[in-house]
Design a protein with these regions (language model features):
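Sec-dependent bacterial lipoprotein signal peptides
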Residues: 1-17
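Subset-of-secretome marker
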Residues: 19-296
Length: 296
């Protein structure tokens, strides 16, 4: 169910990107609060993300898998990759590692296992150019997509202080079918999923709970989502016995629009060294035209 996980990640990411929404006739106060909370551009700050995944039916997958990311970010525009400096940790289900990812316009770096690896200026530039040439729409407006319309049955809840800011909670559900349709509209034609696949994902995913905390300055401070999924009987063998599971995702924004410092870690080993150490052929991840040859 990797697509289910990807949907949740992208859904919260797109909502967090900051886009306007229309007020509905039901739950008008909550809809208006969401619209205000995501209409303000957030160009910099500190972000933390906590992803937890529990699965059933997979031998050896005891307990949840957890991925945490945190660090500063800085926008370079709606169609460009942001500058980031994120620490990450992963634990559970036989996994335990930590590291750091730094993305800047001129290069990208990964710190892992005590070493620093760099993508390289030429390779990173080509990778960014490739992303910009994929053929998908450049902005939500170009695609006619408003992520706030994925939120249904919105209601306001309690107030809570988050990072020194008074916030109001808004709860609702995400419309999975509408979200999947819009994903296809945002994707390049070559990456669009067929209708049958969209229907399978929609059928497999249970209700997706959504929560947002909007600050009294009309900037969102926290997003949370949780969902269960069930793998159809005839797909379980091909999924390694996976029967279903539960996914939760929390994102917290701190110091919105405050200045941040993101600097290069310096020279590092080729990223292909790390990929090979992890058993990943460089061409599989970077593409045949972007793979870095082995030294010697």
């Amino acid at each position: 169910m990797s697509r289910c996980l990807a949907c949740m990640l992208v859904a919260l990411g797109l909502i967090a990107a900051g886009c306007g929404g229309d007020e509905g006739s039901a739950g008008e106060d909550a809809d208006a609060l969401l619209k205000r909370g995501f209409s303000t551009d957030v160009d910099s700050g500190r972000m933390s993300m906590d992803l937890e995944l529990s699965v059933e039916g997979v031998e050896g997958a005891d307990g949840p898998f957890r991925l945490e990311l945190s660090g500063p970010f800085r926008s370079r525009g709606p169609t460009k990759m942001p500058d980031v400096d994120m620490d990450f940790t992963a634990s559970g289900q036989g996994v335990n590692f930590e590291g750091r990812v730094v993305l800047l316009p001129e290069n990208a770096w990964v710190e892992f296992g005590g070493d620093t690896y760099e993508v390289g200026q030429e390779l990173w530039g080509r990778a960014q150019d490739s992303l910009n040439r994929e053929g998908g729409p450049e902005t939500f407006g170009d695609a006619g997509v408003n992520p706030l319309k994925w939120v249904t049955d919105a209601e306001t809840g309690d107030t809570e202080e988050i990072s020194g800011t008074e916030t109001t909670e808004v709860t609702g559900e995400l419309d999975v079918a509408a979200m999947l349709r819009d994903f296809n509209r945002l994707s390049p034609n070559s990456s669009a999923l067929p209708r049958g696949t969209l229907d399978q994902i929609d059928d497999a995913v249970g209700p997706v709970e959504f929560k947002a905390w909007i600050g009294d300055d009309d900037i969102w401070r926290k997003l949370s989502s949780e969902a269960t999924f069930t793998v159809p009987d005839d797909h379980r063998q091909g999924a390694g016995g996976l029967e279903g599971g539960k996914i939760s995702l929390d994102m917290t924004l701190r110091a919105p629009n405050e200045p941040v410092s993101i600097e290069s870690p310096g020279e590092g080993r080729p990223i292909s060294d790390l990929l090979r150490a992890l058993g990943v052929p460089p061409a599989a991840l970077l593409g045949p035209g972007l793979a870095v040859p082995a030294p010697g």
